[in-house]
Swiss-Prot record:
This is Photosystem II reaction center protein H. The lineage of its organism: Eukaryota, Viridiplantae, Streptophyta, Embryophyta, Tracheophyta. The modification Phosphothreonine is found at T3, T5. GO terms for biological process: photosynthesis; protein stabilization. Belongs to the PsbH family. The gene is psbH. The keyword Membrane applies.
Amino acid sequence: MATQTVENSSRSGPRRTAVGDLLKPLNSEYGKVAPGWGTTPLMGIAMALFAVFLSIILEIYNSSLLLDQISMN
């Protein structure tokens, strides 16, 4: 038989630790979703600004955007 059941094993379930007790409140809202869009527009704005930042860095790196104060050797 491929499977075996172990009865009266020494393992008695998960242990309680100090770190687990500290992190427990963070997991208490698991599965609950607030109705509506929430902070989605704010995240969209942050992503757009980050994309603009990355494109500026890429243009500086490719020397398509020349700045007088920055010398690229």
